[in-house]
UniProtKB/Swiss-Prot annotation:
The active site is at R106, E109, S132. Pfam families: Cyanate_lyase, CYNS_N. It comes from Chaetomium globosum. InterPro entries: Cyanase (IPR008076), Cyanate_lyase_C (IPR003712), Cyanate_lyase_C_sf (IPR036581), CYNS_N (IPR048564), Lambda_DNA-bd_dom_sf (IPR010982). This is Cyanate hydratase.
Length: 166
């Protein structure tokens, strides 16, 4: 029986100049240790998406996250990386707009094509407001249909924030 190769996400060198300096170190250690975001998330007690966001500098690590992640990746206790991961993120600058990476562009295209439809349905169900991306969580799952085709299921769960009247 053939050995199944593990898929590992790595850092795209074309965006490295848009990311925090620690991102490259985290990705290098992740690759050397052959760790998936799923396995790192299990170790940290966080979601895969949240952990990946820390690697890309789009989410802030808690002191516990930074300690566990540094230990798991074998980073020096004297390294400034833990403190950097706990700093305030500069969100939304990781890639160009519109996106050029095909998968990210497809997600952008989903919002372009269905954004107003999502908004209309949310407004009908919840009233005038917005979905929080702060009080938020997300997960990515794989489903296989009856024909054997793989499908991706992306869940975006955000707190509903009604607009206030003033």
């Amino acid at each position: 029986m053939a050995e199944q190769r593990q898929n590992l996400a790595s850092l795209d060198s074309s965006i490295i100049d848009r990311l925090p300096a620690y991102s490259a170190t985290l990705f290098d250690a992740k690759t050397q240790k052959r760790l998936t975001f799923e396995s790192i998330a299990a170790h940290l007690g966080r979601s895969e998406v949240a952990v990946a966001a820390i690697f890309y500098g789009q989410a802030r690590a808690s002191p516990e996250d930074a300690e566990k992640l540094s230990r798991l990746l074998g980073l020096s206790a004297e390294s400034p990386i833990a403190a950097q991961m706990m700093g305030f993120p500069d969100r939304g600058r990781a890639g160009p707009m519109p996106p050029v990476e095909p998968l990210i562009y497809r997600l952008y295209e989903v919002v372009q094509n269905y954004g107003y439809a999502f908004k209309a349905v949310m407004n009908e169900k919840l009233g005038d407001g917005i979905m929080s991306a702060i009080c938020f969580n997300s997960k990515v799952e794989k489903e296989v249909d009856e024909t054997g085709a793989a499908w991706v299921v992306i869940t975006l769960k955000g707190k509903w924030l009604p607009f206030s009247r003033f």
